[in-house]
């Protein structure tokens, strides 16, 4: 029975957020289903927002990185997709207009990665490599993200990093990522008697 006896283990907010973030990063780089990915991405964003308010730590928000003229559209599409997936009871026959959900996931995951460092003062291999992945593979990132010009100039130094397929092939083979992945997916925690 699931509820008999003591819990198998406990996780704190930091570990939960890290696991959601790492899962989202792996899903994005592996080019997995964007709808399932969106749920983990938005759960991480919600956790960051709630922790930020509770701990009094400022985090990076959409308002700081999305250009003002695109902010309302961003919010509408991002929230509509999440609410559609979360609240089937509201209108079970409704269809969802799908825009660039993978792009929304990639951008929100970048914010989640930055916010993990702000909230917990830590970086992981997943976070460092995801930041490089996003910067290298997002051809239109400069159109909607307010990063300093030096950031964009620096990307031109690494033209071979633009292929998402290359990242998909090598990401999990990077030793630091492999180590974090094994920790994140250690199911012995769930199966201990």
Regions inferred by a protein language model and the residue ranges of each:
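C-terminal non-catalytic accessory extensions
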Residues: 166-193
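Short, well-structured alpha-helical interface segments that form or flank functional binding sites
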Residues: 12-19, 32-43, 73-80
């Amino acid at each position: 029975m699931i509820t008999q006896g003591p819990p198998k283990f406990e996780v704190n907010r930091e570990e939960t957020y890290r696991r959601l973030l790492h899962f989202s990063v792996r899903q994005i780089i592996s080019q997995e289903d964007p709808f399932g990915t969106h749920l983990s991405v938005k759960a991480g964003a919600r956790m960051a927002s709630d922790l930020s308010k509770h701990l009094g730590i400022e985090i990076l928000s959409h308002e700081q990185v999305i250009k003002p003229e695109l902010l309302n559209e961003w919010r509408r599409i991002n929230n509509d997709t999440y609410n559609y997936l979360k609240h089937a009871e509201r209108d079970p026959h409704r269809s969802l207009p799908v825009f660039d959900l993978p792009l929304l996931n990639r951008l929100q995951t970048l914010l989640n990665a930055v916010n993990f460092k702000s909230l917990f003062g830590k970086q992981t291999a997943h976070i460092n490599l995801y930041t490089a992945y996003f910067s290298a593979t997002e051809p239109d990132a400069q159109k909607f993200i307010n990063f300093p010009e030096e950031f964009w100039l620096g990307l031109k130094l690494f033209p071979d990093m633009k292929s998402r397929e290359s990242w998909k092939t090598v990401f999990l083979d990077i030793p630091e990522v492999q180590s974090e992945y094994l920790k994140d997916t250690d199911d012995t925690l769930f199966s201990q008697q």
